[in-house]
Structures are given as C-alpha cells and as structure tokens.
Amino acid sequence: MIPFLVIPAIDLVQGRCARCILGQPGTETLYSDMSDHPVELAQLWRRENAKAIHVTDIDAIKGLDDDLTMQQVVRMQRAVDVPIQFVTVQKDVESYRRLLAAGVYRVAINRVAWTDPDGVRELLDEYSPSRVIFGVRAHNSDVDLGPDVGMVTDEEFIRHVYELGGRRLIYTECDWEGSLTGQNLDTIRRIAGLTNMRITTAGGIASPRDLWAIQELAPLGVDSVVIGRAMYENTFPCQRIWREIEAELEPELHARFDDDMEQSSISRL
C-alpha cells in the first residue's frame, strides 16, 4: 500500500487556537488551556503520533493583523520535531522568507505566486520545493487571489505554480471546510490529472470511511490529508483511547507542557 499521511490542523486567531478538543470528562482544564497555548496543542498532536502539523493563519486570510500568529507558529515549530506546514496570505515573498529563516519547515504560497513570480522562483531555489509549496482554496473551482489579481480558475493556478517550479499542493474547497460531508473525489481526480505535483487535500473528512476513499487516490499523487474538526471531535476510534489516557494523566501532561514551554521560548520573529 502506498504510504498516506493524516495531518491534524490547528487554526490560529491572534496567536490562539480557534478550536478546542472535546475531551473525556476530567480533562476540561487540559484542553481549555490549550486554546491559549497552541504550543501545547502541537505537542499533544505530536505525542499522539502526528508526523506533520498543519497550521492556518485565519487572521491573514481575513485581512487582519497577524503578528501574534506569525510569532506563535515559529514557537510551535521549535517545540516539535516534525514539520509544520503554515498556510498564510502574505503580500510579499520576503514575509515567507522570514518564516522559513526562522525555522518554520514549510510555507504554502498563494497570491504572491501571481504578483511576484520571479520572487517565488528565487524562494523555491533557496529553500526547495519541499519547503515552499502552494495552497489552493477554491469555490466552484475558482480561486480568489485578492483585489490586485481577482479570480482565476484552480486549473490556471495549478499550472502556473507548476511552471514556477512548485511540486506540492494543498487543495481545499470552501464548501468542504468544517462540513464533515467528505470531499468531492471527482474534483480531486481532476486537479491531480493536471500535473505530477504531490497533493494534500484538506477539509470535509468526517470518518475512517472518508479517509479510505481519499487513500484510493494515492496512485494519482494524493499522499496526505489535513483533518481539522473531525479530529477535535474525536470521530476516529483511536482517539477515544488517547482521550481516556489523557484524562488519567492530566496533571503529568500539564507539567510536561510547562517544562516544554519554558525550553522553547523565543524572541519576537
């Protein structure tokens, strides 16, 4: 079987988690505290065997100031030993370069691929297509790249970034996000057939059955999936075991988190 990666998602708003895990009774303090300390949440997903963590900058997507979120994602990366892939919307290539230089393993580029293609090519050469990837958030197959660019089709965007040297893509449809209704497999097959880029899909996954369906597309280059809401609501069988263990170990976990937070503190980005 072709290896397939499941990546938990953390959404950040002003440096705080937008979601909180629904734990077993007795873990209320553990999980509520994590909303204020995303580093702890990243460490928890790692302890639960995450091989990568997906972080989304909700502030930037909404056009708001995201200084706190930018600082937080660097702290998170320094606190875990697996890659963090960071989806943010920045106005210039230099903002992505600073994140990479600060240690964030992977950044997902969108708008600036259109507004500064030469700068993106340079960034790819400097940091490699493994660390510089591209993000598509589509609606009815259209991608909104902001007032300076407007709408392009997802196919136009994917072919464009492939020509720049991109070799990995995160793809989601707005209607999938938080819906727990699964993903449109025909859409994924269509975008997978455009290039030979590796593809991570995101949004909509609600159950192991949804995962198995996506995994069938692995021969097309779909090698991973980002899961948010379903992971926080414990919809997968293994999670019940994790939450029961965490309920018993809550004081010990907090002690570990406090120690890790002290060791991983950093200066401003």
Language-model segments: what does each one mean?
Residues 24-43:
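Short catalytic helix/loop segments, enriched in acidic residues and glycine
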Residues 119-127, 215-269:
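C-terminal helical cap(s) of enzyme catalytic domains, especially alpha/beta-barrels
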Residues 79-106, 186-223, 236, 240-241:
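Catalytic cores of alpha/beta
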Residues 13-28, 97-177:
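Conserved anion-binding
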Residues 5-9, 52, 81-85, 105-108, ...:
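Structural preference for beta-strand elements that scaffold enzyme active sites
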Residues 63-86, 121-137, 180-208:
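Alpha-helix-loop-beta-strand connector modules within alpha/beta enzyme cores
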